[in-house]
Structures are given as C-alpha cells and as structure tokens.
C-alpha cells in the first residue's frame, strides 16, 4: 500500500502549517512546509547565486526581494525545489502533508502528475481551509514563527500567551512578512493564482474538501479528519 498525500490549501493565516503539523503526527507524515524550504534555500544563498531551469537563470537575490515585498517567487524555481524533495521522500516511502504547495497553476501542473505517478491518485487528499479576508489580515499580523525550525504558529486564544514553540521549545518571533500591506498583497495573489487550482484539481479527478477555518485549532482538525474519511 502506497503512503498518503494530503494537500492543505488556504489563504495566508488560515492555519495550514498548524493543521499540517497535527496531521503529520496523526498519520506519521512528513510535513512539507514549502515556506520553510524556500527560506532555507534563500538564507543559504550567496551573492550572485542562481539556479538554471529550462535554460533560464533564476537569481536567488532577486527571488528574495520578491518574497520580502509580499510577491510570489517564480513558479519554475518553487516547482524545482518541491519536486526534488518529493522524489527524495518517495524513495524513503514516506507520506506527505503539504502546507503551501502547490500555489500556482504552473506549479500544480508540475507537482500533481509527479504525485500521481509516485503515490497514486486514490492516496491524494485535498483540503481547502476557508476564512474571511479580515480574519486573514488579523491573524497574519499576529502570527509568529519559532527561531529554531521556523514552525508557523497561528494566533488563537489557545496560542496568544505562548512564548515558546510547542513543537521544539525555541523562542517565538514575529514573521518578517507580518506587515498589513504585505498581507494584502499575498491575499490578492492567493485569490488570483491559487483559488483557480480548484478547477484544475477537478479536471485531474481530485476531490477538494472545504473546511471552515474560523474555528478553534481543535475544531478545524476534527473537521479535516472527518473530511479525509468521508
């Protein structure tokens, strides 16, 4: 039996990372946090570093500037990093839960066929966590990450007073992209570039289950668990 793949979709601050961590623990999956992979690759890059994909050079310093402005990086570069990691996890026979990929149609067309081939269509589950724009802006402006592993901690009544990461115990700090202007830019990108993926998934015979993300972390998790078993 092939391992399970769960794709968690949702606007910024919807709790994708938190739910992915819970699902990873529940089903013994690798939490594929795309933002963490991006940040680690950019942090390790030196001046002038680039990656050549399809004959085009992608300079990491320029990609970093896009990210800092709340703009999305070039999809070919993201897909390159994501697919390399997927192949490595498949060789280890490890299941995956995604929080942040795929984000664009380009990325989906590169990632989904690979996932189908390596894991099988029946083992791919997609969850869309829904929330209003004002909720997203408020949550994002309060969201924090831990210094050690950059776990994203959703701001809720349960986490408001936390000073240390519940996953690794390191100090919690505010994210660099917590500025309201950056958040609004990301929300615009999400509506224009990510939501259209739902139609693509349907064409690929993949079901998308919707969950109300404006509940407590525990309630959202219960609804996701139910959706996965429907």
Give residue ranges: language-model regions.
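Glycine-rich phosphate-binding loop of ATP-dependent small-molecule kinases
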Residues: 1-230
């Amino acid at each position: 039996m092939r391992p399970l793949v769960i794709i968690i979709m949702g606007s910024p601050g919807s709790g994708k990372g938190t739910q992915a961590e819970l699902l990873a623990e529940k089903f013994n999956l690798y939490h594929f946090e795309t933002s963490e992979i991006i940040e680690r690759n950019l942090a390790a890059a030196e001046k002038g570093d680039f990656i050549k994909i399809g004959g085009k050079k992608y300079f990491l310093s320029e990609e970093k500037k896009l990210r800092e402005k709340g703009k999305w990086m070039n999809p070919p570069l993201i897909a390159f990093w994501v697919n390399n990691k997927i192949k490595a996890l498949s060789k280890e026979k490890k299941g995956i839960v995604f929080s942040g990929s795929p984000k664009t149609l380009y990325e989906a067309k590169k990632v989904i066929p690979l996932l189908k081939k390596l894991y099988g269509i029946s083992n791919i589950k997609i969850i869309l966590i829904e929330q209003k724009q004002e909720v997203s802006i408020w949550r994002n402006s309060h969201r924090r990450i831990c210094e050690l592993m950059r776990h994203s901690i959703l701001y809720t009544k349960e986490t408001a007073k936390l000073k240390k990461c519940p996953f690794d115990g390191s100090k919690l700090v505010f994210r660099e992209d917590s500025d309201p202007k950056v958040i609004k830019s990301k929300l615009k990108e999400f509506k224009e570039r990510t939501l259209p993926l739902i139609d693509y998934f349907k064409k690929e015979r993949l079901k998308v289950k919707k969950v109300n993300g404006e509940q407590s972390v525990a309630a959202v998790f219960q609804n996701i668990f139910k959706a996965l078993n429907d």
